[in-house]
Amino acid sequence: MKISTLVDTNVLIDVWGPAGRQTKWSASVIAACRRDGALIINTIVWSELAPLATEAALRKAVETLKMDRELLPWEAAFLAGIAHSQYRRAGGLRERTLPDFFIGAHAVVAGHRLLTRDAVRYRSYFPDLDIISPETHP
């Protein structure tokens, strides 16, 4: 069975940016997820990557990984708003919906796993989301 994986911004920065302590982990897990099925990038992740490279360079990097591009589903936008509301009630200070809420909600609604290094917030607001992180896949 093929499994699709939405890749979070921080993991892509690990492999496309300067080498750091998470680069090796991120590269190996991206490869493993690619063997399992489709790698997904959405418009939110794309926008977070925009300041880091030219659009042409980002397109080439996405093509190199053979990533599928997806728009944010309407249902995910609603779910992100609900998650943000919970965040605010719990004392969160950001007034505008955080990108992580859109990314997590997209993964939930579309049935994707999420590959991220920031699992804590996603687990808090999307408890049923299948998360791949350094804690779950060392």
Residue ranges and their predicted role:
Residues M1-I41, A50-A61, I132, P138:
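Short, well-structured N-terminal submotif of metal-dependent ribonuclease cores
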Residues I3, D68-R113, R117:
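Active-site neighborhoods of divalent-metal-dependent phosphate/nucleic-acid chemistry enzymes
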Residues V11, V45, A76, F102-I103, ...:
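Alpha-helix capping/helix-boundary segments
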Residues W16-A19, S47-E48, A90-R94:
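Short, flexible loop segments at the rims of nucleotide/cofactor-binding pockets, characterized by
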Residues N42, W46, E55, R59, ...:
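A general structural signal for well-ordered alpha-helical segments in protein cores
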Residues A53-A77:
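Active-site-proximal, substrate-binding regions of enzyme catalytic domains
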Residues E70-P73, I131-E135:
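Short acidic-hydrophobic, aromatic-tinged amphipathic segments that line or gate anion-handling sites
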Residues Y122-P127:
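Short loop/helix-cap segments at secondary-structure boundaries that form the rim of catalytic
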